[in-house]
Amino acid sequence: MKQKLMVGAFIAAVSLSAAAVDMSNVVKTYDLQDGSKVHVFKDGKMGMENKFGKSMNMPEGKVMETRDGTKIIMKGNEIFRLDEALRKGHSEGG
């Protein structure tokens, strides 16, 4: 019984630290012309947030235009990764 509790506590600690690390993985946020945002993670993959603050699907390779007119290409489609960060209260990258 004691061993099961220790294993459970270990798993909980690892899960909590993994969530905290994921929050810090957003290094850049681009505001797009349509009001949505693209968040870039440390590994270069991206997640898309709509103008209502919800993560959304964006096909890899899609060309998007930022508010200042810069064009960027979607790399990856980190819906679940971004959704987790948004649910934890993350709204802006570095």
Curated annotation (Swiss-Prot):
Protein transport found in the keyword field: no
Keywords: Copper, Metal-binding, Periplasm, Plasmid, Signal
Subcellular location: Periplasm
GO molecular function, one term: metal ion binding
Primary location recorded for the protein, binned into one broad class: periplasm
Ranges in coiled-coil conformation: none
Database matches in Pfam families: CopK
GO CC terms, sorted: periplasmic space
Triggers of expression: By Cu(2+). Maximally expressed 30 minutes after induction with 0.4 mM copper.
InterPro entries, sorted: CopK, CopK_sf
Signal peptide range in chain numbering: 1-20
Record's subunit section: Monomer in the copper-bound form. Homodimer as apoprotein. Dissociates into monomers upon copper binding.
Function summary: Involved in resistance to copper. Can bind up to 2 copper ions. Has higher affinity for Cu(+) than for Cu(2+).
NCBIfam families: peri_CopK
Protein name, as recorded: Copper resistance protein K
Gene this protein is translated from: copK
